[in-house]
């Protein structure tokens, strides 16, 4: 009569492990390690967890509703917050725009260009000698601009007039 036995433990065979002293006659046989089996998951445990979650949901729902005989709270005063003037102006300007798709596309392109230029500046800043040279160029240009446009009163007034006229050209005379 033949009998069949099934082992429920897992076995790992490590062929690189050195043979143990207690190994049988053949020294080249691989080492075997047995691992314990995992405990069997009971279905009642999952059912208990589901029931507990349903109980929590039921409690949350009952807490969200009003009690019997209790009237819901109503406010007699309507609380309104005024929008800042710049938001109102922006909303009015957006309503006047005919081609909103083009404006949205330009805004998206501007964000992408800003992101790309920030990456390019970051890459240039990592170069060894370039940041120091660019800083010197910036200091020199700032000094030249200050001397040419801001030191003397007639030059300063001419600069202010040029800025105001450019501002009117961009936004239109209103």
Curated annotation (Swiss-Prot):
Phosphorylated on either Thr-65 or Thr-66 by a threonine specific thylakoid kinase. Keywords: Acetylation, Chloroplast, Membrane, Phosphoprotein, Plastid, Thylakoid, Transit peptide, Transmembrane, Transmembrane helix. This is Protein CURVATURE THYLAKOID 1B, chloroplastic. Belongs to the CURT family. Determines thylakoid architecture by inducing membrane curvature. Residues 64-100, 148-174 are stromal. The modification N-acetylalanine is found at residue 64. Residues 1-20 are annotated as: Disordered. It is found in: Plastid, Chloroplast thylakoid membrane. Residues 1-63 form a transit peptide. Homo- and heterodimers and trimers. Interacts with PSAL. It holds the Pfam family CAAD. One of its GO terms (cellular component) is chloroplast thylakoid membrane. The keyword Ribosomal protein does not apply. It is a multi-pass membrane protein. The gene is CURT1B. One of its GO terms (molecular function) is DNA binding. GO terms for biological process: granum assembly; membrane bending; photosynthetic electron transport in photosystem I. InterPro entries: CAAD_dom, CURT1. Disulfide bonds: none annotated. It comes from the Eukaryota. Disruption phenotype: No effect on growth behavior, leaf coloration, grana stacks or photochemical efficiency of photosystem II. Curt1a, curt1b, curt1c and curt1d quadruple mutant shows disorganized thylakoids with extended stretches of unstacked membranes and broader stacks made up of fewer layers. The chain crosses the membrane at residues 101-121, 127-147. Residues 122-126 are lumenal.
């Amino acid at each position: 009569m033949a009998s069949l036995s099934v082992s429920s433990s897992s076995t790992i065979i490590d062929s690189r492990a050195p043979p143990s002293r207690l190994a049988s006659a053949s020294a080249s046989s691989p080492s075997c390690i047995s691992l314990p089996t995992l405990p069997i998951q009971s279905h009642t445990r999952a059912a208990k967890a589901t029931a507990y979650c349903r109980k929590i949901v039921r409690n949350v729902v009952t807490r969200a509703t009003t009690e019997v005989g209790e009237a819901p709270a109503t406010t007699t005063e309507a609380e309104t917050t005024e929008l800042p003037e710049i938001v109102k102006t922006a909303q009015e300007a957006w309503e006047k725009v005919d081609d909103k798709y083009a404006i949205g596309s330009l805004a998206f392109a501007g964000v992408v260009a800003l992101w790309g230029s920030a990456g390019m500046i970051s890459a240039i800043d990592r170069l060894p000698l370039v940041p120091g040279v660019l800083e010197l160029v910036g200091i020199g240009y700032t000094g030249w601009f200050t001397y040419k446009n801001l030191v003397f009163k007639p030059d300063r007034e001419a600069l202010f007039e040029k800025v105001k006229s450019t501002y009117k050209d961009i936004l239109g005379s209103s």
